[in-house]
Design a protein with these regions (language model features):
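Structural marker of alpha-solenoid helical repeat scaffolds
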Residues: 57, 91-92, 125-129, 166-167, ...
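Beta/coil-rich, acidic/histidine-enriched accessory regions frequently appended to metallopeptidases
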Residues: 30-31, 36, 211, 332, ...
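Canonical positions in the second alpha-helix
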Residues: 53-54, 87-88, 122, 163-164, ...
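Start-of-helix register in tetratricopeptide repeats
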Residues: 29, 63, 97, 135-139, ...
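Canonical tetratricopeptide repeat
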Residues: 67, 101, 141, 177, ...
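Residue-level recognition of tetratricopeptide repeat
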Residues: 36, 70, 104, 144-146, ...
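Structural signature of tandem alpha-helical TPR/SEL1-like repeats
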Residues: 42-46, 75-84, 110-118, 149-160, ...
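Juxtacatalytic substrate-recognition/specificity segment
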Residues: 30, 83, 114-121, 125, ...
Length: 853
């Protein structure tokens, strides 16, 4: 529908608000209502029987053929549904809803010409008799027709669906249409905003409950799951809800559960394209090419030109990181329908994740030209603008894109670390990844989220690897929660190895487990380690079965749950390597690359999954028992006792002498009462009992506070050194230790701590200045110049003096560089006397070294 037609309809609709003119007497509302209730509750066969009888008895009203056709479609009787609609149109030629249904049904039957004709007929009807179509359901139907004809989605949202909502607030039609369109365009915030009150108003409407579940699925998983359950209670055969259940089961690698859900879907509609498409996905993930082809053919049985089938297949494959196969599926969808924009959007994202940027961005721009409302496309193109301000660093094996200032500050160290990871890991796993490995580091968390997930406001991820492409959050985006960015990049490059080596056919738990395992091998301070929470879970028999580890990442309800999933996965890998050797692990990866399933690969190389499960549980429990043996970490008894002061804590400890929460509380209370010696003794004992505790609020950090208050700097430095040997993330402790090293005149250690701090937060100006001072004193000129160069980026207002200091250091080392920097100083501060004097010195030295004629 062209913009003129939209405007004409809207103008007419404004004039006729409140009118609802039909072409005859209304049908018996209670009878129609009964059939509508049957459809809404999933009683499709009963609805079909009732509507068939009503039509045979010549009952009047467009609702009868509409409901009959909808029930036939729900049961997979696609040709019959189209015949019902055509017959209905013969009697109700004015019905825009029947024409819209004809469009959908014709597409479901592969009749594109008939579908196009139905759209044109609606457009003609609206243009000539717009006064007829002002009811909520008509507005919704005509709005969808307008979308199909290429109308601007925002204009449709405002001109049709919003009008249906506002003029008929007691009807669900406008809310359903507006919510569905918002979700189709990725506008989940708007969808949630309008559907939240609608779900309360229409609490028995299964479709509204389902759409709200979809809208909040990222923001509130628990509430979304409850709404999904409510949907299925209202309609046990709700296609969208059952599809979402099956998709979730696929995400969790519960393929048998997904197949059971698919069987339930097919028991209602044996020809449901979505069900067969999801079965195709499972077959492809299981390396069953012939079965996948058969399922795809079944999905396309009635419409071989349906692009939604391949689009769904590709979307799920993409979510499983099978980007090459996913892209191929989207290309197939576009071959069937070159104008199917959702496939173009998904293909653009898949190509970007494959590192095929030129075509990926071209497709994104083309898709945006076709649909300016799609928020995913808007976010992607905003991201492209941000990337245009990045610079590219290269090394033999990597191409790193960073914001320009960040690249100047720590880009050199990024490249060095990545090359170190290549040198260490490629021979270890006997695999050379495709070159170049592309790394993108984002200073804005939303840019990282859009590049990685297609949407902003996704938190909790430090980095992601797609196979050839790594995306990571810059330390600048994590300054409130600092972590070692070096460990993140090492972790992600390990994913490059495991994903590419297996053709992205590796289960998430194994890929994550290997990455964390290799983090710990590279640096004992990196990766997840045993802690009291993990210990309690393990000894409390909450070990996740190996076969369910991948799902543990998706079902985690807290950061602790997620960290435990990483830890468990890494310990499975450690156990495999310690018992069966690294060659067994590599053999599993090789098997996965050929399409062998993980359980079969483990059977072949680790003695079988059942035996591995048993030995792993024993191994992990031994690790837990050996960590802080004899210490009681339980919180329940201490919480029940509710001690309020030091004496009551001591009283509790008389019967619970090894209770860690009580011992820590005792130490804290002793500190509050300034009983330093007693606090020191208590904390020393805790350090001995729990030597592996590297938490920022653990006994070592509290003991360091004791020494700091007593100004016992040597002891404070010693305990902080112990602490920082176990963690690479405690920025505050690292900065304090650097200060202590300055006080002790341990300048080498000042520089060492400066490097540690740089590996957490390279933008700490105070730490850089302290490292610089130590380097200058020790005449470590290379280190000093590096610190000054960093300060040039972070303190541009002091650039003349910084250039001068670099020139002074390099005067005896590299006169050319010295001259360049002194000239830069004078360029920015022409009256800089010291710089003029240095330039003269350089000139005299240059003249003195020139050969005589």
């Amino acid at each position: 529908m062209g913009s003129r037609s939209v405007r004409c309809f809207l103008a007419a609709a404004v004039m006729t608000v409140g009118l609802s003119l039909g072409a005859g007497p209304a049908p018996a509302a209670d009878t129609v209502a009964d059939c509508q209730a049957m459809m809404a509750s999933g009683k499709y066969a009963e609805c079909l029987a009732a509507t068939t009888k009503a039509i045979e008895e010549k009952s009047y009203g467009e609702e009868w053929p509409i409901l009959k056709a909808q029930s036939e479609q729900a049961l997979g009787k696609y040709p019959e549904a189209l015949a019902t609609i055509v017959a209905g149109i013969e009697r109700y030629a004015w019905s825009a809803r029947l024409r819209h249904l004809e469009y959908e049904s014709a597409l479901a039957n592969g009749k594109k010409e008939q579908a196009a004709a139905a759209l044109m007929e609606v457009e003609k009807q609206v243009a000539t008799a717009s006064w007829r179509y002002t009811d909520a359901d008509d507005l919704a139907a005509i709005g969808w027709v307008a979308i199909a004809l290429g109308a601007d989605a925002k204009a449709v949202q405002e001109g049709f669906f919003e009008r249906a909502r506002k003029n008929y607030s007691n009807r669900p039609d406008g809310f359903l249409a507006a919510g569905r369109l918002a979700l189709d365009k990725g506008d989940v915030a708007f969808a949630a905003e309008l559907l939240t009150p609608a779900a309360k108003e229409f609490e028995t409407n299964a479709e509204i409950q389902f759409l709200l579940s979809e809208a909040i699925s990222s923001a509130d998983r628990e509430q979304s799951a409850q709404l999904l359950q409510k949907t299925l209670e209202l309609n046990p055969h709700h296609v969208g809800a059952m599809q979402r259940v099956a998709e979730r089961q696929i995400d969790l690698e519960d393929y048998s559960g997904a197949e059971e859900t698919i069987r339930q879907m097919l028991s209602v509609n044996p020809h449901l394209p979505e069900a067969h498409a999801l079965q195709t996905v499972i077959h492809q993930l299981s390396n069953k090419a012939d079965a996948a082809a058969q399922s795809r053919a079944a999905a396309l049985k009635y419409s071989v030109v349906n692009p939604k089938v391949d689009h769904l297949i590709g979307r799920k494959l993409s979510q499983k990181y099978r980007f090459a196969e996913a892209a191929a599926a989207q290309r197939s969808a576009l071959e069937l329908d070159p104008e199917f924009n959702p496939a173009r959007v998904q293909l653009a994202q898949d190509l970007l994740r494959l590192g095929q940027e030129a075509e990926g961005w071209q497709l994104a721009e083309l898709a945006h030209d076709k649909d300016g409302y799609d928020t995913t496309l808007f976010n992607l193109l905003q991201l492209k603008d941000s990337l245009g301000r990045f610079t590219t660093l290269t090394s033999p094996h990597f191409q790193v894109r960073m914001e320009k200032q960040e690249a100047a500050v720590y880009g050199h160290r990024v490249l060095a670390l990545l090359e170190d990871s290549w040198t260490e890991l490629t021979p270890r796993y006997e695999f050379l990844p495709e070159l170049p490995v592309m790394v993108e580091i984002y200073p804005r968390a939303d840019d990282f989220a859009v590049r990685t997930f297609g949407i902003p406001d996704v938190s909790g991820f430090l980095g992601v690897c797609f196979g050839k492409v790594i995306t990571a959050n810059s330390p600048a985006s994590r300054r409130d929660h600092p972590t070692s960015w070096e460990s993140v990049l090492w972790h992600e490059f390990c994913h490059v190895i495991t994903l590419q080596k297996t053709g992205n056919k590796i289960p998430r738990w194994l890929s994550e487990g290997i990455s964390v395992f290799e983090e710990r091998r590279a640096d004992v301070r990196w990766g997840q380690h045993m802690n009291h929470d993990f210990r309690d879970r393990i000894l409390g028999d909450k070990i996740t079965p190996i076969g369910q580890l991948s799902s543990a990442f998706l079902t985690a309800k807290s950061g602790e749950d997620m960290n435990f999933a990483y830890y468990e996965s890494s310990m499975v890998v450690e156990h495999i390597v310690s018992v069966h050797g690294l060659p067994a692990l590599k053999a599993v990866l090789n098997d996965l690359s050929t399409g062998i399933q993980i359980n079969d690969a483990l059977d072949r190389h680790t003695g079988g999954l059942e035996a591995l499960e048993t030995s792993f549980r024993s191994f992990l429990k031994e690790q837990a028992k050996g960590w802080a043996a004899g210490v009681d970490f339980s919180k329940e008894a201490f919480a029940e006792a509710k001690p309020t002061d030091l004496e009551s804590v001591k009283l509790f400890l008389e019967t619970h002498p090894a209770n860690f929460p009580a011992l820590m509380t005792q130490a804290s209370l002793l500190l509050q009462e300034n009983r330093q010696e007693e606090a020191e003794a208590a904390l020393k004992k805790l350090v001995e009992q729990v030597p592996g505790d590297a938490s920022t609020n653990g006994p070592r950090r509290l003991l360091a506070d004791v020494y700091r208050k007593r100004r016992e700097t040597e002891q404070e430095a010693a305990i902080l050194t112990e602490h920082l040997a176990r963690t690479a993330d405690d920025l505050e402790a690292a900065m304090r230790l650097q200060d202590l090293c300055i006080e002790a005149k341990q300048l080498e250690r000042v520089i060492e701590q400066g490097q540690t701090i740089f590996g957490i937060d390279p933008f700490q100006i105070a730490a850089i200045q302290k490292t610089l001072a130590a380097a200058e004193t020790l005449k470590q000129n290379e280190v000093a110049v590096a610190q000054l160069s960093t300060l040039l980026e972070l303190q541009s207002d002091d650039a003349p003096r910084l250039h001068y200091r670099i020139a002074r250091i390099q005067q005896e080392i590299d006169s050319i560089q010295s001259r360049r920097h002194v000239l830069r100083a004078l360029e920015q501060a022409p009256r800089f006397r010291e710089a003029h004097a240095l330039l003269l010195e350089l000139k005299r030295a240059e003249t003195a070294t020139e050969p005589a004629e």
